[in-house]
Amino acid sequence: MKLGKVELCHFLQLIALFLCFSGMSQAELPRSRSKPYFQSGRSRTKRSWVWNQFFVLEEYMGSDPLYVGKLHSDVDKGDGSIKYILSGEGASSIFIIDENTGDIHATKRLDREEQAYYTLRAQALDRLTNKPVEPESEFVIKIQDINDNEPKFLDGPYTAGVPEMSPVGTSVVQVTATDADDPTYGNSARVVYSILQGQPYFSVEPKTGVIKTALPNMDREAKDQYLLVIQAKDMVGQNGGLSGTTSVTVTLTDVNDNPPRFPRRSYQYNVPESLPVASVVARIKAADADIGVNAEMEYKIVDGDGLGIFKISADKDTQEGIITIQKELDFEAKTSYTLRIEAANRDADPRFLSLGPFSDTTTVKIIVEDVDEPPVFSSPLYPMEVSEATQVGHIIGTVAAHDPDSSNSPVRYSIDRNTDLERYFNIDANSGVITTAKSLDRETNAVHNITVLAMESQNPSQVGRGYVAITILDINDNAPEFAMDYETTVCENAQPGQVIQKISAVDKDEPSNGHQFYFSLTTDMTNNHNFSLKDNKDNTASILTRRNGFRRQEQSVYYLPIFIVDSGSPSLSSTNTLTIRVCDCDADGIAQTCNAEAYVLPAGLSTGALIAILACVLTLLVLILLIVTMRRRKKEPLIFDEERDIRENIVRYDDEGGGEEDTEAFDMAALRNLNAIRDSKTRRDVTPEIQFLSRPTFKNIPDNVIFREFIWERLKEADVDPGAPPYDSLQTYAFEGNGSVAESLSSLDSISSNSDQNYDYLSDWGPRFKRLAEMYGNGQESLYS
């Protein structure tokens, strides 16, 4: 705990000592009677012992132990036969007792804020027997408070807000300080508040700590934040009291007390007449000293000749007024516009209307600049009609365009061929007259939508576009025909007058009054005895049987020509043939079998199925023939077949581990071939002139001579060979010797050459060389057998 001033502490200590000594009078000591005490079966007279009511001053800093009080028993005659002991809270550690006199002292500095009192127990013992002479009694040592704690603001520093323009006495915030001293003892914990910084704008209530405004109409736009320092002092603010301070930041919140104002009374902007609709012309902004919702604006055009041409709206983020175009501008029609624009706060505060008006106006002049515009057509769409029977070169209609600029340049016309790929139409470049360029067919394309281009003669880059919709009028140029391919059947047991088919017709033409078709049989079929036709007068006709009993064996198919006439002018007609098949039907008249050949084919297979089966058989035969041919080719001998190679065999293994074994054997006798040593190596960069040379037989020579000569010859070849590897590279050489009777296989001539060498001895080498003997011996004819 913090201590007060040194002088105050010394003064309080003297007072406490005076109180303690004055309380030691025996007449003032309270008595405590103990219960009767019995020992050895004999009653003992009841004794009593007394002690002070103890108080200890906190924060004692003296060098000697602080005297607390004195314990005394009635049985104590002062002869030293009684000793006193102390137990309980702080006994021996904080409080000690003189066992002879009963004086209690405090050995440590005490702090009431840590512990306000201590509960202890006193005991008087006979010094000789060490037995109690009085019952144990409990007492309390209370710590007396001193003003050693200053007030503290536990929630500081504070921040608060108050609306600007608030009246005097408006509550801002309440601050609270706490004092750890004893509130029930003196004025150590009684706090009062005062303001050290922030006057004359704010004040604080001394007892409650409520901060209030002290000046009226504080303006946020002038100063929006204040820093206050508040003091809390104990001892009711008297001299010698302890104090603590905290800071309070007060922010003035905004109210709508400032009207909007345009920084300029007039504005002027230039825009080209080609500016598209909805484009931004300009942005203007009225200034408002307020912030947030109090600065939100609404703009509107209140007057001027641009009403309906322009509009203005507010940008919610920037609070600017955005002027945009509503209709196209035309320099030739009007060169300038004047707008009267008003800006007003969206939400006005009724308390401050006297500071208004909360709106302002300005003038905006918009100058329209002339630009070179493309030609303009007199109509956005030209509908035209033409008959499909119209001849080439017929005039369909005319389009017209003009230059809207003051120069009024001549206009030339053309057709955008991307909209007329077939080039059905032409247009006169000067007059805009559209004519047909090809014969038209409504059934192919009933409507042609083409784009006409109009460009200035003096500036071809200025192009206007007009749209023409040409509708092709229909003429009766298509004959009627069956509406579908009919599959008509008649049962063998059909009765006369039975309807076997109902037919209808279609026509690609589209007459204005709709189609009307007339059906009849052709002249040569009018008197046939099998079928008749009935026109139903509703663009349909019915086919009926004339006799009963049809037999597939006699005739399985009937062809009935039908004559159809339309109602066009002139009318067109066509003859369509209806195919009627005779079928075997069940009791319900449902056809079961309609083909006479079904009685002939045993398995009921159609012609298509037979063709498919035949194709499969042929495919199998071709595959079998191909396999046989490939096998026969594989039996032909190959000169370089691995089984017929008489070189030394190379045995390869794929085993891993155990070191490396070189199994590629070679015949050392081959090194004895002197010819291999003496012959120069074939140059890689020179084309050989002779493809084959027979090798003569050489006699045997010593091995050391063979190796020396072989290495010497190969060294000279490597020195003069332009294609040889680098100098420090590894050279590998091998040649065939004369140890074999047949010499090297490389000396064998091709079977196609005219060699007369005799290889009959190959037959004596055994079964492994049988094939080689057949190839080069007398039996080589078998190679081609």
Swiss-Prot record:
Localization, UniProt: Cell membrane
Extracellular topological intervals: 28-607
Glycosylated residues in this chain: 449, 530
Propeptide: 28-47
InterPro entries recorded: Cadherin, Cadherin-like_dom, Cadherin-like_sf, Cadherin_CS, Cadherin_Y-type_LIR, Catenin-bd_sf
Cadherin domain sequence ranges: 49-153, 154-262, 263-377, 378-482, 482-599
GO biological process terms on file: homophilic cell adhesion via plasma membrane adhesion molecules
Pfam families given in the database record: CADH_Y-type_LIR, Cadherin
Membrane topology reported for the UniProt record: Single-pass type I membrane protein
Residue stretches spanning the membrane: 608-628
Entry GO MF terms: calcium ion binding
Matching PROSITE patterns: CADHERIN_1, CADHERIN_2
Keywords recorded for this protein, A-Z: Calcium, Cell adhesion, Cell membrane, Cleavage on pair of basic residues, Glycoprotein, Membrane, Metal-binding, Repeat, Signal, Transmembrane, Transmembrane helix
Cellular component GO terms, alphabetical: plasma membrane
Cytoplasmic compartment spans: 629-785
PANTHER family in the cross-refs: CADHERIN-23, CADHERIN-7
Function: Cadherins are calcium-dependent cell adhesion proteins. They preferentially interact with themselves in a homophilic manner in connecting cells; cadherins may thus contribute to the sorting of heterogeneous cell types.
Domain comment in the entry: Three calcium ions are usually bound at the interface of each cadherin domain and rigidify the connections, imparting a strong curvature to the full-length ectodomain.
Protein's UniProt name: Cadherin-7
